């Protein structure tokens, strides 16, 4: 009895190996796509955190503006870049606390529009005290709390077939 060799079996093994290898590559590509989307969302959250911290530092530096509620803000329409230049540059050194607060808010809105897609912002500060101007300058930091909310459109979390963006929000309650 003669044993006949089976022809073409090696080619079938190679085709199965190529199929398994290509499925593995497609899985790796999907993993890479999810990683890029997640990394972008984390980057946007980091930008919002840095911008919020920067605004809180500006508020702490302008104690009178903070006590006089000059930093309260609500934007309803998404901010677009470039924003209009601040009304006052405060370069002459003759700015009031309200001028400094107005400039701080204008610069902050410009930064939001530059670094986040379709952002809106809200700052609301509330205190239970109403001290005099001299007391404001000598008292410890602001006695109330401020709430800051930054929202932006995050297109990285939406299915690719839709044109809508998911709204992401950064909320922070702090004492300046």
Name each region found by the language model:
Residues 2-53:
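Aliphatic-rich helix starts adjacent to a transmembrane/signal segment
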Residues 16, 40-45, 49-176:
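Flexible, low-complexity segments enriched in proline/glycine/serine and punctuated by aromatic residues
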